[in-house]
Amino acid sequence: MRRAFRRLVLIALAFASVAIATPRAQGPSQLGLEELFTEYWNWRLAEFPELATVMGKPQYNDRWTDMSKAARDKRRADMREFLQRVLYFAPGTLNEPQKVSAALLEYQVRTGMEAEPYLDEIQTVSQGDGFHNDVFETIDGMPARTVKDYENIVARIRKVPTVVDQNLDMLREQIAAGTTQPAVVVNLMLDQVRAQIRPSAAESPLLEAFKKFPATIAAGDRDRLTKDATDAYTSAFQPAWRKTETFLRDTYLPKARPQIALTSQPNGKQAYDSLIHYYTTTRMTAADVHRLGEQEVARIETEMQGVARQAGFTGSVADFEKQLATSPGGKWTSKEEMLTYARDVAMRVYPELPRLFRRLPRMPLGVRPITPDREASTASNYSRGTPDGSRPGWFNMNTYKPQEQVKYRVEALVLHETIPGHHLQIATQMELEDLPEFRKAFIASGFTEGWGLYAESLGSELGSVYLEPSTKFGQLASERFRAVRLVVDTGIHALGWSREQALAYFQQHSPGESTAEIDRYIARPGQALAYKLGELKIKELRRRAERALGSRFDVRDFHDAVLRNGTLPLDLLDTEVSTALKIQ
């Protein structure tokens, strides 16, 4: 998923962190509910210009989000006002779609209130989500079709020093409060910042769009824009990034905590419980999640053993994995081979989708490698496109050291990130005409990542993937990987596991995973829990529907019931699917 966009969602929800007053009586200026949704959406676009860019709204493409303390305080007041107003509307006065939208708006604000004290510290300094990566991802996602588009890119590069100053002020707040990130995370971010400082503007990904202009832009404009971009890079970006490096190295790192557990911070247990709820949209405790993870690992490994037997292998699951990884052709020979195969899988799957779905998105899909400055520490992910299709959805594939990556798990990965996974779900959501605009942009990890993992299992119902025992084994290995996360994330942040303990558990139950995975859980407590918990809820709903409907069950109707409302918290998803299919 696109990390810059996800961080914007987190920030937007976080600004609801003030006490809630009793809703006031309706006055002459009180807007109706639909108008409130529109006002809230327009406010978010103006307050979070990067979100507007992601959603294909160009009016704020020359700006960055104002992260000064004054702006953050003002947004808190604004969000309190929005919550007061949505609480005014009694559910009995609303139709069903309005009830869902009002409940979702209230959920966004209330959940943000609970998690706000902990979100900034885990988002500002991170090898996956840090502000340094947001700058690059936002520029990469900007349109580059007109002179104005290019001028917007230049304007944003020129304003990077302000972005840096405001974020460094937030890091100073963390130091004062004793809520810094672990040193291991800071060092990873430092490595990325250093790699992003290129000797010349021509070498920087920030200026990629200036290497090839559309034919409609005149030569004189091309020369001017290139000169302006080069000047912005050397006079604004480079000094700001060096300032970031110096601050992280000399000021923040010495204050970074040596412990990796969130519970080592003041109020750490409360923080972790809040983040579990925030990311998973459930009220499960860390202990419950840990036990469930252990149960799921054992169950899935039993299934994996059965697949190995079908392949004629009589040894252990671990031995079969080793055989698949070390056999001739078991790993990739090049980055291009990986990308070509991923594209082929998506092309094979697409014609099969009408068997499982009534509605397919129009948004185009592309596959590209993760950039070299991030590939050593960033997992494969999906970046959403724009509703008008001018920017496709992108599967950003990690092709780092291809000779060390196994082949048998890639089909599941492609299904997760593209179709019928993230691309199908997110693009469909963005194209739902009846949804208020704020809902088209909403992401909740429990639903979105749960759908991605559920989508991996749908390969068994398609006719073009998992044709060999090895690739079905790979799908189960991918599912087990998400179950292992339940154990490891809670092990680190609730049970006090060391980095070495976490890696040892991974090597025992999901061999081949690197320390980069462990470091991801250290940097983002609770987020990795969303995949398995969301998938289990969707599978539970499907079993209930199959049991209740019997021969009348149609998987296309089930998928439509899950996807037709866009992203929902899991409890609200349960209610909506049960109502749509008339099941208990």
Please annotate each region the language model reported.
Residues 1, 17-18, 38, 411:
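A general, composition-driven signal for non-globular sequence regions
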Residues 24-584:
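N-terminal maturation segment of proteins
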Residues 13-22:
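Hydrophobic h-region of N-terminal signal peptides that target proteins for export
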Residues 1-12:
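Bacterial N-terminal signal peptides that target proteins for export
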Residues 12-13, 50:
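A periodicity- and composition-biased signal for non-globular, repetitive helical segments
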